[in-house]
Structure formats: C-alpha cells, structure tokens
Amino acid sequence: QLMSDFSPPRVSTSFERKVGASLCKASELAMSDKLPKFRLVSAPTGGSKTTSSIALLAMLANEDKGFTGAYICKTIEECEYVYRQLKRLVDPSVLAVYTSLHKHEASPTKLLEKKKELGLEIHDHFDAQDLFSSRLIITTHSRWKKEYDDEVDLGVRKYKGNQRNLFIIDEEPELFSIFP
C-alpha cells in the first residue's frame, strides 16, 4: 500500500526488501528477552528504512492489539509524514502525534509559516495526554530526549504506565553536545 504512493507506483527493489528484512530482524531482537535491547539498521538515504519502519509498526499494531510502539523523528515535518502514512494503515484511534505544531494550542502563525515554507498542512491536533493513552505515537527526538534528561514521563517511553514494546528512532539523534 505504501509503495503505491510513489509516482509512478513501483515495486520494491531487492535492496529495499533486504533493508526491510534487516529492520524486522532488528525489531524482533530489540523486543526479545535477549540483551542488548538496542539495534541499529543503517542504509543509505532512499534505502526504505522509513517506509519499512512504518509498514512494520502498522503490521504489529494491526496483528497484536497489545502491541505498543513509538516512532521518534528528527523534525516536525517527518512526524507529520509518518503520522499520515500510519493513519492510513491502522485504526486512527490507536495513533497520536505530538509536536509543537500538532498540539491543540499550536501557534496559528507557526502553522501558517510552515505551510508557506514547506507546504506543510497539519490538520489533526492532539493533547500531550494523548501520548499516554495511544498505542502508537509519533514525536520528536527532543521530546524523547527530554524524558531522559529531566527524568519525567511524557508518554513517550510508556503506554498506560508500561514500557512500550518498540521504539523506532529515525535518523541519528543528538544525544549530547560538546561546547568549547
């Protein structure tokens, strides 16, 4: 279903299928009882990491009603893209996206700026509390990192008080900075 979004629609390449298989295996290992819990899938830009990740989350959420996951993006634009794709593949009631532009009190000025600058139109808005009660969430690196830095529960790592089953962190997050 995701492949039909391309213009013209196309089938996945052998390389993209291998990336998808690697992502599935890494996710399986990350969710298993084996340590370490972190797995990395590296592929060049356009290698289908994002598309495979979206498809995997959708499949897991649709097949296992107890599955919970978080997709962590670098930018608001990426969050909106992932949200739109997942919204087509899963029951929207299990899904929430939360960024400064997805919250109900988002600045109309900022929304207009992003529309003019990037053609980004955000129509669905959520409360921060929606992260705690949604099986699948999408948010930014900064919110995910804030949970660790401030030692607070912002609904990213946990669903209804329990650790989420799977976290997909798209792109390399800046986990620390070095200042001169």
Give the role of each language-model region.
Residues 43-45, 74-76, 139-143, 171-172:
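Structural motif
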Residues 62-64, 128-131, 158-161:
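Conserved catalytic network of the ASCE P-loop NTPase/AAA+ motor domain
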Residues 90-148:
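Inter-Walker segment of RecA-like/P-loop motor cores
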Residues 50-52, 59, 66-90, 94-104, ...:
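Conserved Walker A/P-loop ATP-binding site and its immediately adjacent core
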Residues 34-55:
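Walker A/P-loop
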Residues 68, 133-137, 163-166:
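Loop/turn-to-beta-strand initiation segments
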Residues 141-180:
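Signature of the SF2 helicase/ATPase Hel1-core->accessory helical subdomain module
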